[in-house]
Amino acid sequence: MKLIFTEYSAILIFFAISSLLSSVIFLLSYFLIPQKPDQEKVSAYECGFNPFDDARATFDIRFYLVAILFLIFDLEISFLFPWSLVLGEISIIGFWSMIVFLVILTIGFIYEWYKGALEWE
């Protein structure tokens, strides 16, 4: 148990300091900045123009689909980057497990493309 704590103590200290610092900055900004909401601050901003319509209008479902697809393939990169850093040190099982992961994601991407999820009509 002591060996594990020794190895991860730097990460734990970094996490604690960053959490404390971000909390202090957030609380200071909340208490020190005057809170005076007016009509201009609470209205929707449309690139300098007056809003044409209500800002609470519904979005097209394609925006959500694009956001979900972005998250999926962004997470793929978060798994792929550490794997590429330790590629020379891992065994053949680690290599082929990532290849299987990439093949599954590629098949999913081809399926989405075939079904027209990426088309904007």
From Swiss-Prot:
GO MF term list: NADH dehydrogenase (ubiquinone) activity
A cellular component annotation (GO) from this entry: NADH dehydrogenase complex
Location within or outside the cell: Mitochondrion membrane
EC number: 7.1.1.2
Topology term for the membrane: Multi-pass membrane protein
One Pfam family from the record: Oxidored_q4
Job description of the protein: Core subunit of the mitochondrial membrane respiratory chain NADH dehydrogenase (Complex I) that is believed to belong to the minimal assembly required for catalysis. Complex I functions in the transfer of electrons from NADH to the respiratory chain. The immediate electron acceptor for the enzyme is believed to be ubiquinone.
HAMAP family named among the record's database cross-references: NDH1_NuoA
Protein name: NADH-ubiquinone oxidoreductase chain 3
Biological classification of the source: Eukaryota, Rhodophyta, Florideophyceae, Rhodymeniophycidae, Gigartinales
